[in-house]
Amino acid sequence: MSRPQGNKWIGIAAVSGFCAVMIGAFGAHGLESVLSEKMRANFETGVRYHFYHTFALLACGILHVIHPSKLLEPAAICFLTGVVLFSGSLYVLAITGITKLGMITPIGGLAFLAGWITLLLHTIKPPQHPAKER
């Protein structure tokens, strides 16, 4: 991941954070009286994991600037995929009640886990410094 790649993931994290706040506010104020308690809990779980993994995306971007690694891009992709599949499926499930969407949620959870493992590998693998120009 080059420095612009790190900045790209910081930008994506900013958009994700904005969306998490907006979706959370919509759930708390716009859906409060519409959703059942169970569906509201599903929605809130989606928002919570959306926030957690927005910070993970941000960490991938910042880490790249400090300690570059080819592993940070795949980790960030996994976190973003997890947000879309895990949180996104919970949002749609809560609003529409389509329970078949619940089958997508674990795939998003696996993407989150893959992101965390890849980030762990980044801490274990020695940094890959580009050759210095002479």
Language-model regions: role of each:
Residues 1-3, 127-134:
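Short, charged juxtamembrane terminal tails flanking transmembrane helices
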Residues 3-17, 71-79:
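Interfacial segments of alpha-helical transmembrane regions
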Residues 12, 78-81, 104, 111:
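Physicochemical signature of membrane-embedded alpha-helices that form the seven-helix bundle of GPCRs
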Residues 15-25, 42-66, 79-82:
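Core segments of alpha-helical transmembrane spans in multipass integral membrane proteins
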Residues 16, 20-23, 60, 82-89, ...:
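Membrane-embedded alpha-helical transmembrane segments of multi-pass integral membrane proteins
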Residues 28-42, 89-110:
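Interfacial helix-loop-helix junctions of multi-pass membrane proteins
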Residues 30-33, 67-70, 96-99, 122-129:
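Juxtamembrane transmembrane-helix termini
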Residues 63-99:
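Mid-chain, well-packed structural core segment of small domains
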